[in-house]
Each structure stands twice: as structure tokens, then as C-alpha cells.
Amino acid sequence: MIQSITSQGLVLYNRNFREDDKLVKIFTEQVGKRMFFVKHAGQSKLAPVIQPLVLARFLLRINDDGLSYIEDYHEVMTFPKINSDLFVMAYATYVAALADASLQDNQQDAPLFAFLQKTLELMEAGLDYQVLTNIFEIQILTRFGISLNFNECVFCHRVGQAFDFSFKYGTCLCPEHYHEDERRCHLNPNIPYLLNQFQAIDFETLETISLKPGIKQELRQFMDQLYEEYVGIHLKSKKFIDSLADWGQLLKEEKK
């Protein structure tokens, strides 16, 4: 079945196909992720809008049994501030790849599309891209079938405690029940507290957010542990972020 639709869409990536053609993967609001064929991409009027992290309203010809086609576009947003900063662009690319990994092709998920779009808009507006990424990561876990409780102790259900996380139980322990898991994570109690807050944050009302560098580093390390344990995906974009962290540390040392 072939149908023409108009939909908001975010370009996830493109790759070469034959000599001058490209396959372009777009996450659309209406019909989910689709692969689109662009013939003679280098000379095509579509060339400006088939680059990664371009958001536009596309006129699309959708083919449920094969490749789809881009017929036209308007209302283009290119996120210039994101693209002008290597670090921000790396994190933006990662959250887009994470959304891609969490959703099957051809499956509509308008709430996820809106969440990804708002994340990129907040990065473009200058909010802390590392913290925005952590919030995106913790909220998108449900798309991988993972639900974690950072609000209460698994044994006594008390709230507002200096919680630690236990991979043995897959949830939090209060100080009175730390002994239940000798291999608990020994986290800074601020980490479970922040993740509990992050799970409830609504990006539509978020205006500012700021955390100290040390806390952000601890968050990053624990999020990596969570994803390794529960999700098990290894995205190239995440590996690039890790390499940038090493590079950034080298730059700091050279400036001393």
C-alpha cells in the first residue's frame, strides 16, 4: 500500500546507496521510522534536508512494502547552535540514536517523537546538554521494557532516605537495609534522588537546570552501569561521547 502524507520528521542518518543515491532514515511523527530513497542526492533539491538532525515538515510517499520517498519539505529547523559545538552535537546525535534503538521501524510513537524534538530544542536553547541527556536516558528506559523505582526502599517502602541502588534487587535500599546487599553500588545519595526527580520532569515546563561537574560525572557513570546491566546496547554515538570525554580531559591537562 502506498500513501502520501504530510508529517513532521527528524533525519536520524543517511548512507550512500549506489553511486549518487542515498538512503535516509527519518523518524516521523505520524508513521514512525522509515527509510527513504533519494535519487541523485548530490544534485537533489532535497540535499539540504537529508542531513542528520534536520527537522522539517515533509511531504512523504509511504510504501509499506518497500522504500518510501520524500516528495517535498518546508518549515526546516537545522539546530545551528547544536551543530556548531562538537560536544553538544555528539550528545544530540546520541539521544537521536537512543530513540532509534528503542523503537521498531514503521511503529508510530508520537510521544517519543515529541520528547526527542523537545530535548533537541532545549539543547539548542543552551540548557545543559549532559543533564538533558541523562533525563532522556532515564525516561526512555520504559521503551526498553525497564521500570526502575528510585523513590522508596524495596524492603520498608520508606521515602526520602539516603538511598543506594542494588542491582541484586533492581531498586533502592535505605540505610537500614544496606546490609541486604553487600555489593550495593555505594552511590552518592544525591544520584538516586536526582534520578527520581528526572523520571518526573516534564520538558515542556523545564526552563533551567544546572548541576555541579562532579555530580554530572557520577550520574554519567551510574547511567552507563544501568544501561550495561539492563539494556545492553552499544551505540557508536555513545562510544564517541566516551572518546570526547577522554579528549576533553587531555585538553584540561594541557591548559594547566
From Swiss-Prot:
Q: Which superkingdom does the taxonomy of this entry point to? A: Bacteria
| Keywords recorded for this protein, A-Z | DNA damage, DNA recombination, DNA repair
Please list every transmembrane segment annotated in the UniProt record, as residue ranges.
Answer: none
Query: Entry's Pfam families?
Result: RecO_C, RecO_N
Q: Kindly state a single biological-process term from the GO annotations of this entry.
A: double-strand break repair
Q: What happens when the gene is disrupted?
A: Mutant is sensitive to the alkylating agent methyl methanesulfonate and the DNA cross-linking agent mitomycin C.
Give GO cellular component annotations, separated by semicolons.
bacterial nucleoid
Similarity-based family: Belongs to the RecO family.
Protein purpose: Involved in DNA repair and RecF pathway recombination. Plays no role in chromosomal or plasmid transformation but is required for resolution of chromosome dimers occurring as intermediates in the formation of merodiploids by transformation.
Q: Which HAMAP family match?
A: RecO
Protein name (Swiss-Prot/TrEMBL): DNA repair protein RecO
Species this chain originates from:
Streptococcus pneumoniae (strain ATCC BAA-255 / R6)
Q: What broad taxonomic lineage does this protein's source fall under? A: Bacteria, Bacillati, Bacillota, Bacilli, Lactobacillales
